[in-house]
């Protein structure tokens, strides 16, 4: 089966004055994706929002609370949607010199591995959408894919 995985992060920059980083992965069978998109657009329009309005928790406000509550109900009630999140605490206390070749971004992608690894199964295929963090992000994402495939003995990168 083919799955689509949507990834996002919060407080992921090294010097953002936050000791916590959150990574999330929402996923569904790819064949269900269009219906889910359509349902979410309809919820936005029902609440007077543009159908292309970007959903962000920082945009939650008293005037949009009913929209966000209905959206949460939709996520909890839709058995086609699945979610995995990772909360990394103590981000400001990490010793990157000792554990990550003095490279914060290496730690960042290790956390993405920890987020996605429990989702990935050898018998399925995945279309994983990850924000490219910076100009080095494309290469890092390719390396993440290679490591994830190797972890499930997919040395040809077919998953």
Enumerate the language-model features and the residues they cover.
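Phosphate-ester processing/binding pockets and catalytic centers
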Residues: 1-159
């Amino acid at each position: 089966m083919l799955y689509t995985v949507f990834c996002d992060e919060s407080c992921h920059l090294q010097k953002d004055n936050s000791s916590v980083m959150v990574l999330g992965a929402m996923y569904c069978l790819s064949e269900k994706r269009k219906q889910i998109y359509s349902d979410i657009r309809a919820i936005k329009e029902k609440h007077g929002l543009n159908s292309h309005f970007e959903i962000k928790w920082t945009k939650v406000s008293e005037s949009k609370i009913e929209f966000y509550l209905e959206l949460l109900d939709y996520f909890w009630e839709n058995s086609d949607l699945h979610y995995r999140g990772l909360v990394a605490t103590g981000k400001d206390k990490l010793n990157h010199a000792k554990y990550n070749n003095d490279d914060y971004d290496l730690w960042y992608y290790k956390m993405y591995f920890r987020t996605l690894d429990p989702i990935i199964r050898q018998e399925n295929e995945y279309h994983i959408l990850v924000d490219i963090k910076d100009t080095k992000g494309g290469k890092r994402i390719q390396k993440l894919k290679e490591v994830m495939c190797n972890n499930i003995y997919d040395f040809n990168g077919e998953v």
